[in-house]
Amino acid sequence: MQIYSSQTHKKAEFEPIEPGKVRMYVCGPTVYDNIHIGNARTFISFDVIRRWLIASGYEVTFAQNLTDVDDKIINRANEQGRTAAEVATEFSNKFIDVMRRANVIDPDVRPRATKEIGPMIAMIKTLIEQGHAYAVENGDVYFSVRSDETYGEVSGRNIDDLMVGARIEENEIKRDPLDFALWKAAKPGEPSWKSPWGEGRPGWHTECAAMVHRYLGVPIDIHGGGSDLAFPHHENECAQATCAWHQGFSNTWMHTGMLLVNGEKMSKSLGNFFTLEEVLEKHSAAALRLLMLQTHYRSPLDFSFERLEGAESSLARIAGTAQNLRWAAAHATGEPDAALAQKLADAVAAADAEFKACMDDDFNTAGALGAFFGFITEANSYLDAADGAVDAEAVVTAAEFIERSMDVLGIELPEQEAELPVEIIALAAERAGYVGDDTAEAAEALIAARAEARAAKDWAVADAIRDALGELGLVVEDTAAGARVKAK
């Protein structure tokens, strides 16, 4: 398995620190508002990466934090006349709920920053003792960037270049404009905790570094997030951890590409800003995932509702193909053509191999789905050519490949067959002489009666059956695998 490191800008063979096990951390949200679809793209991407690692036989421990104390939360609380804790609790719960709606698996560990103050203070004390951090008179504590000889390696930045763009303020209390806060002295009305430097709260970068160390140990195998976090957040996390514990922080850094909307950067001022919650009110999570995974996780993703509608249509085609394959297996007639069946079996094997090869090549979901859609065409061609005389084992294997591929991507296919209404039994008794009490058998009887009427060119009877089914919210669908009754 090859994984691209955004630190080295190269793919390399993935070798976990502990054979067969993966320790993985992805930065969670700052919980002051509903997450937008750009955030969702990152979380869905790493959900699929996690799923593929598990499917590949790894034991994965996945941690993701909730940043529940931060300037943004405090500002939102002040705007609304609420406490920071109330805002953080509301949007923490909303985040967890919408992630589940998006079929993102819960993390194994979900630490909240406000519950981890002790480990953060311990890390800051260690950094001060080792000369990598310093407290100032007002109670702030800063990390000395120049004390870390490796600073800039995660994001590819150079300290001299950073100095050119650094803001140098009057009465600067920091020793160096590049230094960043590990601990912020308390301000009136803000959440704060006791520390050796007085009341205050941790800096954002400090939170993640301390939580990774506590719950996963360092170094970890994979640290991920959106590309906007590479600098300064991930750079500063790594600097603290490396200097505090004298070990590498993460063996592989992974970052997702930006999300655009109709080719433009998403922003509220342009009116193209969408939360995940509002998108999922009108569209399925499965279609959204399918749309997002048709672009490689590192590439920019151009989102549009037209493309999302297209993904809904593709999803229906996928589900319909799987349904047709299973239906054909259950209703096979005649002697199957061995050569045709072998061609289908070969297509399954080839698509399966290509899907796996793409996923093992830096989780290339776009390539994997390309192979997958090629197979969907092959499967439908087989059903057309077989004309009901299918090889049951071959078509079931094909359906299983479709379902397995979607499952590993976290894409839940629409219900394959809605339960037929009980009224269809009386209709079949009236129109087809059916005497049983099974809805599926009743549907078969009506299909047979309709086919018989059409063969006799008795269009009035055939149309009457069609119309009566329509009144029950049903339709007869003619497929390559044969006719069947389904909900409209």
Model-derived features with residue positions:
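Short, glycine/charge-rich beta-strand/loop segments that flank catalytic centers
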Residues: 66-71, 92-95, 105-120, 138-147
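N-terminal, positively charged nucleic-acid-binding surface of large information/translation enzymes
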Residues: 8-11, 17-105, 481-485
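Structural preference for alpha-helix termini/caps and helix-kink/transition segments
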Residues: 275-488
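Alpha-helical recognition segments enriched in aromatics with Gly/Pro capping
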Residues: 1-32, 47, 118-328
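Alpha-helix C-terminal capping/helix-coil junction sites
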Residues: 54, 100, 128-129, 254, ...
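Short phosphate-binding/catalytic loops that engage adenosine nucleotides
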Residues: 58, 132, 474
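The substrate-binding groove and active-site-proximal loops of carbohydrate-active enzymes
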Residues: 77-84, 108-114, 198, 226
